[in-house]
Amino acid sequence: MNQASITYRKLQAPSGNGDCFIEPPVSESLSYLHANHQRFAAFTDIEIGGLSFTALRQQARDEIITAAQEHTKTYLDLTNTEVTATTSIVLTGHQPTLFHPGVWFKNFCLDHIAKRTQSLAVNLIIDHDLVKSTSIKVPSQTRNAVTLKTIAYDLSGSSNRIETTGIQDENLFNSFPQRVADQLDVFVENPMLESFWELVQQAPTDVVGQKFSQARHQLEHRMGMNSLDVPFSTLCRGASFARCLLHVLKNAARFRDIYNAAICEYQKVHRIRNPGHPVPELEILSDRIELPLWSWTSSTAQRQRLFCQVTAEQLILSDLPASFELRLDLTVSPSECVEQLQAWQQTDIQFRP
């Protein structure tokens, strides 16, 4: 790669109250959908994990639609959601946290674009990330000034993975909307947090992140939006993810070279001296190649970096502290390898980007 191979546009969020930044413009959404279809149709000679790109793309489409329908119908009526084999998918996503309106704005844009292009709107719940905070900042008025007060909705748990984190302190969790309302009464007469929190508490799940996302999704449907939600962790257990993972594992050395070269180019173009920004380069430890993936087992509270040793007949997967070692036989068919990767994730080992 060289510095001229990629051109970065300078994008800047607007500073005015009520302003928004949408790129590309919503008016061009249909043309972008058509361009993507044409681009993907040209990938006729690409094979990933023993499957053609076209077949893998169709498999991934089927998986995400099925998974999104199965997940969403546990708390919403999907009678009016119709999906056909030719339906396009428009996608967005975010961590299932108490995010600000600027993030929520994406979901309204998603719904508008889907209706404009007669597509299926899917919100990807980024639950493979970590819980960054269990509190929010609320404006509080004192005699002389307005300050920000931190109000916690829960305590921090031993595991900080969003997809597995449950409620740590029921009393703290249940009293959250009232404690926020007590601080906001000077500024907001009827905060929507109370009705939102009722949906949070009624959600048929023990995972806090899913409680937040399901409550948010129900509010959206009450406002006339029509979309599906699906946790990314669910897709990571599917066959299409496993097949992509197999392709990366088998080509670990080449993948690492391309990945690190892209980081170096980005740093040069933006004149970044911090070697860890935007992300660290992948390492090689002895004969083990690091991949941009996390792994954990039921016995490890924290996620660990994933490493792969590649031989002619097998792939050896392990984490940095060597809490596990898995051997994937390459003498069998790619489909059998995919089944083995899926089987590991159904038992004790998890792989996430």
Q: Where on the chain are the PLM-derived regions?
A:
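N-terminal, positively charged nucleic-acid-binding surface of large information/translation enzymes
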Residues: 2-33, 37-38, 51-53, 109, ...
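Internal, well-ordered alpha/beta segment that forms a basic, Gly-enriched binding/recognition surface
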Residues: 123-220
